[in-house]
Amino acid sequence: MNVAIEAMLYNNKNYASHHKTNELISTWKQHLSSWDKFNSVPRLFIKYEDMLDNTKKILLHIINFINSLTNLSIKKNNDFLENILNTTSFNYLQLLEKNIGFNEATNNSLFFRKGISNQWKTVLSQNQKDLMQNELEIPMKQLGYLV
């Protein structure tokens, strides 16, 4: 866990991807900041916690965002929405990963593990939490993770 936290906080490296090209892996703070400052492209910022709290409302928000940028005019009938909600639910994706795999998973653990919010508060040691909060205080407050 310490290695993952250090990578999230301090690493800014190029890694060879499975496509055999180098990919820049920036810190979490840099990643967030780059999207925040990228004003030339419309973007929609959604937190995982918000999706958990009101999935259907967030789905409608996503559809409205896509419709505002395209000529697709995605219909929002109940059957269509329920199909999206069912096939993108955490439990469904977790089942798919167990049955057929998932490219983003590591060899040692599943990608879709628990699907709960704020798990970092119970999983990380106090030292790890303090380190993250000290390094990421401003963005964590902006996102509502700290008060």
State where each predicted segment sits.
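Short His/Asp/Glu-rich catalytic/ion-coordination signatures at enzyme active sites or charged loops
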Residues: L110, K114-L124
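PAPS-dependent sulfotransferase catalytic domain
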Residues: M1-F111, Q126, D130, E137-I138
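C-terminal helix/juxtamembrane-tail motif
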Residues: P139-V147
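Generic N-terminal initiation segments characterized by hydrophobic and/or small/turn-forming residues
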Residues: K121, Q133, E137-M140
